[in-house]
Regions:
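Short N-terminal or domain-adjacent regulatory/targeting segments
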Residues: 216-243
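Active-site metal-binding motif and surrounding structural segment of the metallo-beta-lactamase
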Residues: 43, 54-101
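Conserved beta-strand hairpin/beta-sheet module of binuclear metal-dependent hydrolase folds
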Residues: 3-64, 154-157, 161-165, 258
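Metallo-beta-lactamase
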Residues: 4-8, 102-152, 196-202
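Active-site neighborhood of phospho(di)ester-bond hydrolases with catalytic His/Asp-centered motifs
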Residues: 48-50, 72-80, 100-103, 163-167, ...
Length: 388
């Protein structure tokens, strides 16, 4: 279990979810996920977000335990997505004296989710640079629109130098899971927030002006040490620069012949000095991990079967995800297969040309049904070009 202790005045009241199969009904989470929420205990009590309704009872139990009979003065709403906001109405009803602290956009969106009586009187709308004094503790509000919803804000507590970062610096994986941070944080960032790199960069510039000693995200562990490492990862991911040198070989094969060619391409790349080669079978491997690997490495080989005069759907799905997540600044190589009219390369190239700052290798490997020695020779040429 990850350490959730923050301080005597700032408490963790979130919960792990280890039975949810798909996050956002699309992303595999074999090690679950945490829904994080926090309480600041001072002259005034502030609750920092709620959690998913799957863990409502646990959240209220944790909250009551920390409050020890005290009442809530403020419920700070950083983000209205239901995995963080599901219990806003329940909390508002339970603590009728509490003010809801939120951005103007969040106030406008709130009635779409909940019918809260006397909403105007209950809301304390804050904007960029506003502060809220709780006693010794003082919250500064920083707007973070489109990271990754329009109403999002983060909060900086100046006394203990804590950044409550909303979905920023989150990761997949329950706190009970024993795993390192980077891989599941990368997969989370790329697939949840990746499209909004410019907005993340804007937020990081604001954060750079703050003296941050602890980061409290809405998913994943509380970050207390080596914060420069985590911030550095976010700077790289949000700038769309490759994280490390290497080649991703992603294939979509119908009967196995295209996969055999892709596996041979892996061998050829290694023989030609590739520092690292990663293979993903898009028909069976986790698509979200494949997308994350495309962000991780600067060079990508795509191997796809032709299908219905186009591209085999798993590859088409993968490429559209890359476009949707705004991948850019990459070099691509293409391998196609077709028994009578290979056309996958043309289809893949058409999608890639919609991306920013991409280079597509001139050498294209076009296979007729099964791999031949002449195809391997073409792979050698492609390997030399993409590794140059």
């Amino acid at each position: 279990m990850k350490d959730t202790y923050i301080s005597e005045a700032v408490k963790y009241i979130g919960a792990d979810d280890t039975t949810l199969d798909l996050f956002e009904s699309q992303y595999q989470i074999p090690n679950g996920v945490s829904y994080n929420s926090y309480v600041i205990l001072d002259e005034k009590v502030a609750v920092m977000d709620t959690i998913d309704e799957r863990k409502t009872d646990e959240w209220f139990a944790n909250l009551e335990n920390v409050l020890n009979g005290r009442m809530v003065d403020y419920l700070v709403i950083s983000h209205l997505e239901p995995d963080h906001a599901a219990n806003i109405k329940r909390a508002a009803d339970k603590f009728p004296q509490a003010q809801l602290v939120l951005s103007a956009k969040a106030k406008a969106m709130l009635p779409q989710f909940f019918d809260i009586a006397h909403l105007d009187e209950r809301c304390l709308v804050v904007k960029e640079g506003d502060t809220l004094e709780l006693g010794i503790h003082k919250l500064h509000f920083v707007m973070a629109p489109m990271v990754h919803w329009p109403e999002v804000m983060v909060e900086y507590e100046e006394t203990e130098k804590i950044l409550f970062s909303a979905d920023g610096f989150g990761k997949f994986g329950a706190l009970s899971a024993e795993e390192e941070w980077t891989d599941e944080a990368r997969r989370y960032f790329i697939n949840i927030v990746g499209k909004y790199g410019v907005q993340v960069q804007t937020l990081l510039k604001k954060a750079a002006a703050l003296d941050i000693q602890t980061i409290c995200p809405l998913h994943g562990p509380v970050l207390k040490e080596n914060l420069g490492f985590y911030i550095g990862k976010y700077l790289t991911w949000s700038s769309y620069e490759p994280e490390e040198d290497g080649v991703l070989v992603a294939c979509a094969s119908i009967h196995g012949n295209t996969k055999a060619a892709a596996e041979k391409m892996v061998e050829v790349l290694r023989a030609n000095g590739a520092s690292k080669v990663v293979f993903m079978d898009l028909t069976r491997d986790d698509m979200a991990e494949a997308v994350a690997d495309a962000f991780r490495y600067g060079k990508i080989i795509l191997a796809a079967a032709s299908y219905d005069a186009g591209v085999f759907p798993p590859m088409e799905d993968f490429l559209h995800r890359l476009v949707h997540k705004n991948l850019q600044k990459r070099t691509f190589g293409l391998i196609e297969n077709g028994s009578w009219a290979p056309c996958a390369a043309k289809g893949m190239k058409g999608i890639l040309e919609g991306m920013k700052e991409v280079n597509i290798c001139e050498n294209v490997v076009s296979i007729k049904s099964t791999m031949k020695d002449t195809d391997v020779a073409k792979m050698e040429e492609l390997a030399k070009e993409i590794l140059a």
